[in-house]
């Protein structure tokens, strides 16, 4: 969303090295007044943390700090973190084959194809499976709006046909990092039930044990599919401060309050580029890897992006995290 991006860029200018020793609180005041005046009317909260400490926090709705914010597709990044927690415990691998966790569905695939047996967890983490699934294409078989019309979202995903590559569309071999990217909510949505089968726990319980409790997140609220699986493609509700904690966790290399919550190896792997999402944006394991130009200087970010401008930006070079939430 344009408004969230503009606020981010305005605040980011404060965090450049030149301003490291002289924080300009007046700029935060200006941002607050701009939102209140209706210039960015959909924004509900902004939080800025630097060096692990919150230096600016403001809420523009009645809910305030305690309100749960619908993270939209930023939920996907949480799903990637939970995959990492399972990998850290030896219960899952990025190379694990998706259909291996759903043997009960092999015999009833709508479009059976031997190549589906080779689709991996990593393919879903990087939005680059061979399934024909593109939320940005309204006629795509795998568009998420079609998924929401049926009861079984995992079967919907596994039933999708194989994606075609006409001569004007780059193949994986012709694409950066050897992967052809397309935004597909169905993939991360399927990772939820897959994680449950791998760890043998309901996903909300696993998330509470390995991620939320260690970070002091006490009030996470999941959305659920028609078959009562936690929805890992979107809809998780967290407070603004909880979103900051998730960004700070990765900025800290997986550590929180002196404890290694997620392995540093998984954090590095998640934040490495695995596919190219846009001409100027790479994609990790459900993280957006984007460099902005602020005041003529490149500023690298790792992003949790949700529809409507709900975003968490991690700025590794500035040791900072910015959270923007919207209606």
Describe the function of each predicted region.
Residues 6-17:
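Bacterial N-terminal signal peptides
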Residues 34-63, 319-323:
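A short, well-structured edge-of-sheet supersecondary motif
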Residues 38-45, 61-105, 112-119, 173-183:
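Short active-site loop at a secondary-structure junction
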Residues 52, 69-95, 124, 191-195, ...:
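Active-site SXXK
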Residues 85-104, 199-222, 257-264:
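Short, well-structured active-site flanking segments
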Residues 100, 111-217, 240-244, 248-249:
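Active-site-adjacent helix/loop patches that line small-molecule binding or acyl-intermediate pockets
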Residues 187-194, 234-255, 310-327:
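Active-site-proximal alpha-helical segments within enzyme catalytic domains
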Residues 218-220, 268-321:
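Active-site Gly/Thr loop motif
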């Amino acid at each position: 969303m344009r408004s969230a991006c503009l606020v981010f860029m305005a605040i980011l200018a404060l965090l450049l090295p030149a301003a490291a020793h002289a924080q300009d609180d007046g700029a935060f005041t200006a941002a607050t007044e701009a939102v209140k005046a209706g210039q960015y009317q959909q924004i509900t909260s902004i939080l800025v943390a630097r060096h692990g400490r919150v230096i600016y926090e403001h809420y523009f709705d009645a809910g305030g700090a305690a309100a749960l914010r619908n993270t939209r597709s930023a939920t996907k990044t949480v799903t990637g973190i939970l995959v990492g927690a399972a990998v850290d415990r030896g219960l899952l691998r990025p190379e694990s084959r998706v259909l291996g966790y759903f043997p009960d569905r092999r015999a009833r695939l709508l479009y059976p194809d031997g190549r589906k047996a080779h689709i991996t967890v990593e393919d879903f983490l990087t939005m680059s499976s061979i399934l024909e699934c593109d939320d940005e294409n309204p006629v795509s078989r795998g568009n998420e709006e079609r998924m929401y019309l049926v009861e079984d979202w995992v079967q919907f995903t596994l039933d999708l046909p194989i994606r075609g590559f006409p001569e004007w569309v780059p193949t994986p071999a012709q694409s950066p990092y050897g992967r052809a990217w397309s935004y597909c909510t169905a993939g991360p949505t399927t990772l939820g039930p897959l994680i449950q089968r791998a760890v043998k726990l309901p996903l909300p319980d696993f998330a509470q044990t390995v991620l939320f409790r260690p970070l002091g997140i006490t009030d996470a609220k999941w959305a659920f599919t028609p078959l009562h699986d936690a929805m890992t493609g979107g809809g998780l509700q967290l407070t603004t401060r909880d979103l900051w904690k998730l960004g700070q966790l990765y900025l800290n290399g997986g550590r929180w309050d002196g404890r290694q919550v997620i392995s540093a190896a998984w954090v590095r792997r998640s934040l490495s580029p695995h596919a190219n999402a846009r001409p100027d944006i790479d994609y990790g394991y459900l993280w957006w890897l984007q460099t902005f130009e602020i005041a003529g200087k490149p500023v690298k970010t790792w992003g949790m992006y949700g529809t409507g401008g709900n975003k968490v930006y991690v700025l590794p070079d500035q040791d900072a995290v910015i959270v923007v939430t919207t209606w």
